[in-house]
Amino acid sequence: LTEYFIDAAQSCPLCFRHVAGGAVCGSCQKKPPAFDRMWASLYYEPPVSSMIRELKHLADLGMSRPLADLMCQNAPGWLATEHFDFVLPMPLSKERRLKRGFNQSEALTDILAKRYGWTLLPRHAVFRRHGEPQSTLKSDERRRNIKNAFKIKAELPKACNILLIDDVFTTGSTLDELAKTLKKSGAGKIFCWSLARPPMKK
């Protein structure tokens, strides 16, 4: 599935939109996100999107390992140069987690953390308010829906670096809001690694 790997050399380092030469895109220059670096490994299109749906909506947890393997095959170049004090899967609200029975980002993160020897931030450290599923909303609705959705319930070490893991990166509004909340609570650099993102217009 290497043909679905996103070429970082031709992507904005902050939103992974296609940009010749890998420069920061105009949108991110105008309004930089709260996180410091972003990476998405694959394009969200068949068969990758079908594999993610099997994990996320059909509760096929066996799909988490091959998907994590694909992430590692196209991993961020900055993994070798940056230090992470904690790794955190994108939190789900209590209501959504109970309904689904698991957190798909957590399933991926557990595999990656063992592979790279990372320390997981405890699940109870971050609370997420329940709201409408982001995938059902338009861009401006996503920003309103996710505003003030997170609350840090644990004391973070001052200036700690955190790596966020998510399954699908679309507009980045959820990761941006979480990064903003973490930094307000004392975190240092925030890095984001997403399994996939939809293809963007060049």
What residue ranges belong to the model's regions?
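Glycine-rich phosphate/pyrophosphate-handling loop used in enzymes and phosphotransfer proteins
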Residues: 1-202
